[in-house]
C-alpha cells in the first residue's frame, strides 16, 4: 500500500540542504517510489541592524547582519520500505526536516 509523505527541509547552509536532497533522491530511485521535487520555496532573509559604537556617542554607523533560511519541499509516494530507508538517512545538524504523512 502506497503512502504519501511530504518532507519540508530548511537550513541556513544551502550546500548541506542540497546534499540531503540528493541523498533522498537516491533512496527514492533505488526503491522505485514516485517523487516530486525538490521544489525550492522562497528564501527567508532575517536582517539585524546593530550600532557599531558601543557607547552610543559619535557618528551613527551601523552593521547589518543577515541570515538566510533556504527551504525545499519533496513529495514522495512510496511503500513502507521506502519510508524506513528515508528515516535512516544521516542528516546534518544544520538541516531541519519536517515530515507530514498524508
From Swiss-Prot:
A GO biological-process term: translation
SUPFAM superfamilies found in the cross-reference section: Ribosomal protein S10 (SSF54999)
GO cellular component, one term: small ribosomal subunit
PANTHER family, sorted: 30S RIBOSOMAL PROTEIN S10 FAMILY MEMBER
SUBUNIT field: Part of the 30S ribosomal subunit.
Physiological role: Involved in the binding of tRNA to the ribosomes.
Disordered, as annotated region: 34-59
Transmembrane segments: none
Name of the protein this chain belongs to: Small ribosomal subunit protein uS10
Gene behind the chain: rps10
UniProt keyword annotations, A-Z: Ribonucleoprotein, Ribosomal protein
Organism per entry: Methanopyrus kandleri (strain AV19 / DSM 6324 / JCM 9639 / NBRC 100938)
Recorded coiled-coil stretches: none
Similarity annotation: Belongs to the universal ribosomal protein uS10 family.
GO MF annotation: an example: structural constituent of ribosome
Amino acid at each position: 500500500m502506497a503512502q504519501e509523505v511530504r518532507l519540508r527541509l530548511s537550513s541556513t547552509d544551502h550546500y548541506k540542504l542540497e546534499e540531503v536532497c540528493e541523498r533522498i533522491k537516491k533512496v527514492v530511485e533505488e526503491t522505485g517510489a514516485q517523487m516530486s521535487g525538490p521544489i525550492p520555496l522562497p528564501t527567508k532573509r532575517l536582517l539585524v541592524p546593530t550600532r557599531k559604537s558601543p557607547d552610543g556617542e559619535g557618528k551613527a554607523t551601523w552593521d547589518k547582519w543577515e541570515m538566510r533560511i533556504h527551504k525545499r519541499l519533496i513529495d514522495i509516494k512510496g511503500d513502507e520500505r521506502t519510508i524506513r530507508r528515508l528515516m535512516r538517512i544521516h542528516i546534518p545538524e544544520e538541516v531541519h526536516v519536517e515530515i507530514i504523512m498524508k
